[in-house]
Amino acid sequence: MPDDFKIPRATLKRLPLYYRFVSILKGKGIDRVNSKTISEALQIDSATIRRDFSYFGELGKKGYGYNIDSMLEFFKSELSESDQIKIAIIGIGNLGRALLTYNFSIHDEMTITEAFDIRPDIIGENIGDVVVKHSDDIKTTLESEDIDVVILTTPDNVAQQVADELVKAGVKGILNFTPRRIKTPQDVQVHHIDFGIELQSLLFFMKNYSK
Protein backbone atom coordinates (compact mmCIF):
# COMPACT_ATOMS: atom_id res chain seq x y z
CA MET A 1 0.00 0.00 0.00
CA PRO A 2 1.48 3.42 -0.98
CA ASP A 3 2.77 5.62 1.86
CA ASP A 4 0.42 8.44 0.82
CA PHE A 5 -2.65 6.16 0.74
CA LYS A 6 -5.45 7.29 3.00
CA ILE A 7 -8.13 5.02 4.42
CA PRO A 8 -11.60 6.24 3.29
CA ARG A 9 -13.46 8.40 5.82
CA ALA A 10 -16.42 5.99 5.92
CA THR A 11 -14.08 3.19 6.92
CA LEU A 12 -12.36 5.34 9.54
CA LYS A 13 -15.72 6.07 11.18
CA ARG A 14 -16.22 2.34 11.67
CA LEU A 15 -12.80 1.78 13.27
CA PRO A 16 -13.98 2.48 16.85
CA LEU A 17 -16.81 -0.06 16.40
CA TYR A 18 -14.38 -2.72 15.23
CA TYR A 19 -11.93 -1.83 17.97
CA ARG A 20 -14.51 -2.12 20.74
CA PHE A 21 -15.83 -5.46 19.46
CA VAL A 22 -12.37 -6.96 18.97
CA SER A 23 -11.36 -5.78 22.47
CA ILE A 24 -14.35 -7.66 23.90
CA LEU A 25 -13.31 -10.81 22.04
CA LYS A 26 -9.76 -10.44 23.35
CA GLY A 27 -11.12 -10.23 26.88
CA LYS A 28 -12.93 -13.52 26.31
CA GLY A 29 -9.74 -15.24 25.23
CA ILE A 30 -10.67 -15.48 21.55
CA ASP A 31 -7.71 -15.22 19.18
CA ARG A 32 -9.42 -15.23 15.75
CA VAL A 33 -12.68 -13.96 14.27
CA ASN A 34 -14.25 -14.03 10.80
CA SER A 35 -16.18 -11.32 8.95
CA LYS A 36 -19.49 -13.17 9.37
CA THR A 37 -19.22 -13.02 13.16
CA ILE A 38 -18.31 -9.33 13.08
CA SER A 39 -21.18 -8.65 10.67
CA GLU A 40 -23.75 -10.32 12.91
CA ALA A 41 -22.50 -8.53 16.01
CA LEU A 42 -22.21 -5.02 14.54
CA GLN A 43 -24.97 -5.22 11.90
CA ILE A 44 -22.53 -4.25 9.15
CA ASP A 45 -22.62 -6.05 5.81
CA SER A 46 -19.90 -8.71 5.48
CA ALA A 47 -18.77 -7.31 2.13
CA THR A 48 -18.29 -3.89 3.74
CA ILE A 49 -16.24 -5.42 6.54
CA ARG A 50 -14.02 -7.32 4.11
CA ARG A 51 -13.52 -4.16 2.04
CA ASP A 52 -12.69 -2.16 5.18
CA PHE A 53 -10.23 -4.77 6.35
CA SER A 54 -8.55 -4.88 2.94
CA TYR A 55 -7.18 -1.41 3.77
CA PHE A 56 -5.65 -2.66 7.02
CA GLY A 57 -2.96 -4.96 5.62
CA GLU A 58 -2.40 -8.64 6.41
CA LEU A 59 -4.65 -9.19 9.42
CA GLY A 60 -5.86 -12.63 8.40
CA LYS A 61 -6.24 -15.26 5.70
CA LYS A 62 -9.29 -16.34 3.73
CA GLY A 63 -11.07 -19.17 5.50
CA TYR A 64 -8.90 -18.73 8.58
CA GLY A 65 -10.22 -15.50 10.05
CA TYR A 66 -8.60 -12.34 11.37
CA ASN A 67 -5.99 -12.39 14.11
CA ILE A 68 -7.27 -10.55 17.20
CA ASP A 69 -3.86 -9.34 18.41
CA SER A 70 -2.92 -8.02 14.96
CA MET A 71 -6.25 -6.21 14.70
CA LEU A 72 -5.90 -4.61 18.12
CA GLU A 73 -2.39 -3.45 17.32
CA PHE A 74 -3.54 -1.91 14.04
CA PHE A 75 -6.62 -0.21 15.50
CA LYS A 76 -4.60 1.28 18.34
CA SER A 77 -2.02 2.65 15.93
CA GLU A 78 -4.72 4.23 13.76
CA LEU A 79 -6.91 5.60 16.55
CA SER A 80 -4.02 7.05 18.53
CA GLU A 81 -0.25 7.22 18.45
CA SER A 82 -0.16 6.97 22.25
CA ASP A 83 -1.58 4.49 24.73
CA GLN A 84 -3.42 7.21 26.67
CA ILE A 85 -5.58 9.95 25.18
CA LYS A 86 -6.19 12.96 27.40
CA ILE A 87 -9.41 14.84 26.69
CA ALA A 88 -10.88 18.11 27.94
CA ILE A 89 -14.57 18.95 28.22
CA ILE A 90 -15.95 22.48 28.10
CA GLY A 91 -19.39 23.30 29.46
CA ILE A 92 -20.42 21.41 32.60
CA GLY A 93 -24.20 21.57 32.34
CA ASN A 94 -26.40 18.49 32.63
CA LEU A 95 -24.87 16.78 29.58
CA GLY A 96 -21.32 17.82 30.38
CA ARG A 97 -21.69 16.57 33.95
CA ALA A 98 -23.05 13.23 32.73
CA LEU A 99 -20.18 12.76 30.27
CA LEU A 100 -17.64 13.74 32.91
CA THR A 101 -19.12 11.31 35.42
CA TYR A 102 -19.12 8.50 32.84
CA ASN A 103 -15.62 9.47 31.67
CA PHE A 104 -15.22 6.63 29.16
CA SER A 105 -15.37 4.01 31.89
CA ILE A 106 -15.11 1.16 29.36
CA HIS A 107 -12.26 2.74 27.40
CA ASP A 108 -9.02 2.50 29.36
CA GLU A 109 -7.10 4.44 26.71
CA MET A 110 -9.31 7.56 26.86
CA THR A 111 -9.78 9.81 29.88
CA ILE A 112 -11.26 13.25 30.45
CA THR A 113 -8.56 14.94 32.50
CA GLU A 114 -9.66 18.59 32.33
CA ALA A 115 -13.05 20.31 32.65
CA PHE A 116 -13.99 23.97 32.20
CA ASP A 117 -16.97 26.23 32.83
CA ILE A 118 -17.64 29.91 33.55
CA ARG A 119 -20.16 29.59 36.40
CA PRO A 120 -18.65 30.54 39.77
CA ASP A 121 -20.77 27.98 41.64
CA ILE A 122 -19.27 25.02 39.77
CA ILE A 123 -15.63 26.11 39.49
CA GLY A 124 -13.52 24.06 41.89
CA GLU A 125 -16.09 21.26 42.09
CA ASN A 126 -14.72 17.73 41.82
CA ILE A 127 -16.71 15.61 39.36
CA GLY A 128 -15.49 12.11 38.63
CA ASP A 129 -12.06 12.97 40.08
CA VAL A 130 -11.73 15.97 37.73
CA VAL A 131 -11.71 19.48 39.20
CA VAL A 132 -13.65 22.03 37.15
CA LYS A 133 -11.54 25.05 36.15
CA HIS A 134 -12.53 28.48 34.87
CA SER A 135 -12.76 28.81 31.10
CA ASP A 136 -10.15 31.57 31.25
CA ASP A 137 -7.61 28.80 31.90
CA ILE A 138 -8.44 26.78 28.76
CA LYS A 139 -5.55 27.85 26.53
CA THR A 140 -2.88 27.68 29.23
CA THR A 141 -4.05 24.31 30.52
CA LEU A 142 -4.49 22.62 27.14
CA GLU A 143 -1.06 23.75 26.01
CA SER A 144 0.70 22.72 29.21
CA GLU A 145 -1.09 19.35 29.37
CA ASP A 146 -0.64 18.71 25.64
CA ILE A 147 -4.36 18.11 25.07
CA ASP A 148 -5.59 18.35 21.50
CA VAL A 149 -9.02 16.66 21.78
CA VAL A 150 -11.99 18.49 23.31
CA ILE A 151 -15.65 17.70 23.95
CA LEU A 152 -17.81 20.80 23.51
CA THR A 153 -21.07 20.99 25.50
CA THR A 154 -21.46 24.75 25.90
CA PRO A 155 -24.61 26.77 25.09
CA ASP A 156 -24.84 27.08 21.31
CA ASN A 157 -24.57 30.89 21.35
CA VAL A 158 -20.95 30.70 22.54
CA ALA A 159 -19.91 27.50 20.75
CA GLN A 160 -18.14 29.23 17.85
CA GLN A 161 -16.32 31.64 20.16
CA VAL A 162 -15.07 28.75 22.29
CA ALA A 163 -14.10 26.78 19.19
CA ASP A 164 -12.00 29.72 17.99
CA GLU A 165 -10.17 29.73 21.33
CA LEU A 166 -9.60 25.98 21.08
CA VAL A 167 -8.01 26.39 17.66
CA LYS A 168 -5.66 29.01 19.10
CA ALA A 169 -4.75 26.53 21.84
CA GLY A 170 -3.69 23.95 19.26
CA VAL A 171 -6.71 21.64 19.48
CA LYS A 172 -6.97 19.28 16.51
CA GLY A 173 -10.22 17.46 17.28
CA ILE A 174 -13.58 18.66 18.62
CA LEU A 175 -16.58 16.48 19.47
CA ASN A 176 -19.38 19.02 19.23
CA PHE A 177 -22.59 18.31 21.15
CA THR A 178 -24.00 21.81 20.60
CA PRO A 179 -26.66 22.56 17.93
CA ARG A 180 -24.30 25.11 16.35
CA ARG A 181 -22.36 23.96 13.28
CA ILE A 182 -18.99 25.40 14.25
CA LYS A 183 -16.38 26.36 11.66
CA THR A 184 -12.71 25.50 12.01
CA PRO A 185 -9.60 25.36 9.80
CA GLN A 186 -9.25 22.28 7.59
CA ASP A 187 -6.63 20.73 9.85
CA VAL A 188 -9.06 20.69 12.81
CA GLN A 189 -11.50 17.78 12.73
CA VAL A 190 -15.02 18.38 14.06
CA HIS A 191 -17.63 15.69 14.63
CA HIS A 192 -21.14 16.98 15.31
CA ILE A 193 -23.37 14.94 17.62
CA ASP A 194 -27.05 15.91 17.32
CA PHE A 195 -29.37 13.72 19.38
CA GLY A 196 -32.41 14.97 17.44
CA ILE A 197 -30.93 13.91 14.11
CA GLU A 198 -29.81 10.57 15.52
CA LEU A 199 -33.32 9.88 16.82
CA GLN A 200 -34.87 10.88 13.50
CA SER A 201 -32.48 8.51 11.74
CA LEU A 202 -33.39 5.72 14.16
CA LEU A 203 -37.12 6.27 13.60
CA PHE A 204 -36.59 6.25 9.83
CA PHE A 205 -34.82 2.90 9.94
CA MET A 206 -37.44 1.49 12.32
CA LYS A 207 -40.19 2.52 9.91
CA ASN A 208 -38.54 1.42 6.69
CA TYR A 209 -36.31 -1.51 7.57
CA SER A 210 -37.84 -3.27 10.57
CA LYS A 211 -39.42 -6.62 9.82
Swiss-Prot record:
Q: Which domain of life is it from?
A: Bacteria
Q: Which residues form a coiled coil?
A: none
Q: Which UniProt keywords apply?
A: Cytoplasm, DNA-binding, NAD, Repressor, Transcription, Transcription regulation
Biological process, per Gene Ontology: negative regulation of DNA-templated transcription; response to redox state
Q: List residues annotated as DNA-binding.
A: 17-56
Predominant location category: cytoplasm
What is a GO molecular function of this protein? DNA binding
- Binding residues for NAD(+): G91, I92, G93, N94, L95, G96
GO CC annotations, alphabetized: cytoplasm
Checking InterPro entries in the record gives: CoA-bd, NAD(P)-bd_dom_sf, Rex_DNA-bd_C_dom, Tscrpt_rep_Rex, WH-like_DNA-bd_sf, WH_DNA-bd_sf
Q: Where in the cell is it found?
A: Cytoplasm
* UniProt similarity note: Belongs to the transcriptional regulatory Rex family.
Function, as annotated: Modulates transcription in response to changes in cellular NADH/NAD(+) redox state.
The entry describes its oligomerization and partners as: Homodimer.
Protein name as annotated: Redox-sensing transcriptional repressor Rex
What organism is recorded for this protein? Staphylococcus epidermidis (strain ATCC 35984 / DSM 28319 / BCRC 17069 / CCUG 31568 / BM 3577 / RP62A)
